[in-house]
Amino acid sequence: METRPFVPWEQMNAFMIDVFKAYGVPEEDARICADVLLESDRRGIESHGCNRFKPIYIDRIVNGTLLPVTKIDIVKETPTTVVMDANNGMGMVASHRMMELLIEKARTYGMAGGAIFNSTHYGIAGYWTTMAEKAGMIGISGTNARPSVAPTFGVEPMMGTNPLTFTMPTDEDFPFNFDCATSTVQNGKIEYYERSGKPTPAGLVITKDGGTMTDSGAILKEMRKGNCALLPLGGLGESTGGYKGYGFTTIVEILSAALAGGPYMKALSGKNPDGTNRMYRLGHFFFVINPEFFMGLDTFKTTAGGILRDLRASEKAPGEERIYTAGEKEHLAWLERKDKGVPVGESIQKELVELRNKWNLPYHFSFED
């Protein structure tokens, strides 16, 4: 049972827009950024929602590693491809423009692909692929990130958590939406554990001596020093398939950097050798596929829906009541939350009040009663 107070969706949306604007983000861009963060909370992905509003976006605008005004330059374009320079502006704004371009290209040519460099955190990858799904198409996206994941048989943080996302239309009430990091856990989840006062489960982090860590705050601190790292999907070594996750992480790293000729791995740390801040210069990639250029959208949706229904109807393991398919839990989270709002713990409450008071914004939150 949820015990945290809720902030209504409309109020949180308006508040974040006003705060973004106060820090110099143009209103149209602020609306995009607020919606991306709220969509994460709508889906129950709290590691990438309002939990990150201040530390990942506002604080980075303040420290100069994220520019509030996004100057987008298209450095190369063909009928089916786009390469975009985000010039260290809002990654969410550049990604929104990219998906608009690719969807229109895919309407005409059936497929389209794009790459962005010199970017910043773009929120949940599934937001961009869902833009394609809402247009009746298939969306694929991934991004690199600051180094935090060790290669199989290694202990040094080399690559980011590098999410890989696929969203596909179905004939059900929700799409197939597979959106996950290619590591055992994402940084945002550990940040969420730390802010909630919870430990990180054992076995997700490897230390220099091959051990593990569970203190969430210590993990975040030591990872930035290079003293521990996250493990790729599959975990430690090869016996449980860690090399497979390592492969997926590497695929995302290559596509995120090489398609646009951008930086990679240690160059994305956001820190200079002397410890001072610098731009993150992240890279993202996007692909859009139009089913109408194959056997048609209706055929695709019916077949996809049939596959998902057969999976959910298959024999369950002892003690399990339900089999889920990707995107289903996010849909259920929205049904649970749509009339309530965004759940906010104590740390987020403090940040909301701090930002409101700093800019003298006319908001009163229910948790203050």
What are these regions (language model features)?
Residues 149-223:
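Phosphate/diphosphate-binding glycine-rich loops and adjacent basic-rich segments that engage nucleotide
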Residues 48-103:
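Active-site cofactor/substrate anionic-group-binding motifs, chiefly glycine-
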Residues 1-9, 14-33, 38-39, 50-65, ...:
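Acidic, glycine/proline-rich low-complexity segments that act as flexible tails and inter-domain linkers
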Residues 199-265:
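Secondary-shell segments that build the walls of catalytic and ion/ligand-binding clefts
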Residues 2-12, 254, 259, 263-369:
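Catalytic-core signal marking the mid-to-C-terminal active-site face
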Residues 75-85, 96-112, 214-234:
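Residues forming anionic-ligand binding surfaces in small-molecule and nucleic-acid pockets
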Residues 81-171, 177-181:
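A generic, well-ordered mixed alpha/beta core segment in the N-terminal half of proteins
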